[in-house]
Every structure is written in structure tokens, then in C-alpha cells.
Amino acid sequence: GSEMCIRDSLLTIEQCNVVMIQECGQFILPAQHSGRYHYVVVEHAGAYNCRCNTCIIADLNFVASIHYLISGTGRSAICLNYNGCNIYTLHCESGSGAVGDIRDLVRHAVSPFIIGGDMNSTPSELSDNLRIMTTGTRSRPGNSAYFACCGMPTHISGRELDYFLIDSRLQLKTCVRGYHMKGGDHYPVILEI
């Protein structure tokens, strides 16, 4: 389907080191990529259909950890360490549930980190609800992150729902929207650090 075309384009044409896919269905990495890429798929807690899952693919062998968010939504996040940076991906609950999902993941992310996925809320909706994306206090600093967005709609609804939160210690090079492919309702977003 379209997910396979997008995935293959990101791996071969764009040469992405890490690819995050949400709602990937019964995902299996094709034989053409075996040996070069490794992946992990996790279902959301309470999910009863094959769409409710998240996948992360990387061009190196890795051990991923799965985080069940303490946000009341039952969502899961996958983390892998790539060259010293902890990369998390998730598919947030729609609407106000996204705030709890993101807040919990930023709070527990191990620095330096990148969080990316289908946030199901626009950056302004999240930042309005979260004010400044930080955790902790003056005497006990927590994590802080900034939004890395392409500034364009990433969903066929015309809203920007797919973007990244980046540890404040990391520097963004680019964040761009890829081209849309038939069958999917989201555009791929490509981040370079």
C-alpha cells in the first residue's frame, strides 16, 4: 500500500537513518531491506485492531525500549538510542489526550532526545495547553524541548499534525514536508539534526 511506497522512498531516496511510522497495520519489513534495516512494532494498550500501532526503523541494529505512557490514553511510545541520541516515536490520542501523552513523554525522556510522530494536535494547540514544554522546577531542572515543524499541513484535513519535539540541547538543521502519496492521509516529515 501507500505506507510501503512512503517507507521505501524514505529509506532509499531520502536515505533517512531512522523512519517512524504510525498506524502501520500488519507491518513487515520486506526482504530487500533485511540486513540493512532493523525495526520494532508495538501495539497501543487496549488496541483491538491492527491499525493501532507504532513502528520505528533504523539503519543499524538496536535494542528498543517501549514506554507505556502514564497519561490515561493507553498509548505506547518506542525509543531507540541512535548515536547517543534517544529517539522516541508515538501516535497521540486525538484532541486533548495528546497533551497528556506528550507531557508524559517529555517528562520521562532521557536527554538528549527527539520525539516525533502523529501528534493529533497542531503545535499551537499543544503549546497553548503546555505553555513552555518543560518539566521540573528551578531547583530541580527537568527536560525542555522545542517544536521542530515544517510549517505546512501534514494531514489531508489541512492541519499540521506530524512534527517533532527536540531536546533544547540539540540544534535543528531542517524540517521539511515530503510529498504526498495516494492512499495515506498524512505527509511524511523529514527532520535533520
Please report, for each region that a protein language model flagged, where it lies by residue.
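A short acidic/basic microdomain associated with nuclease active sites
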Residues: 36-46, 64-68
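Active-site regions of metal-assisted phosphoester/phosphodiester hydrolases
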Residues: 2-3, 7-8, 49-193
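Loop/turn elements at helix/coil->beta-strand transitions in domains of secreted/extracellular proteins
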Residues: 14-18, 37, 85-86, 110-112
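Glycine-rich, phosphate-binding/catalytic loops in enzymes
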Residues: 31-39, 129-134
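N-terminal, active-site-proximal structural segment of metallo-dependent hydrolase catalytic domains
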Residues: 1-34
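Short active-site-proximal "capping" loops at secondary-structure junctions
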Residues: 24-28, 44-47, 90
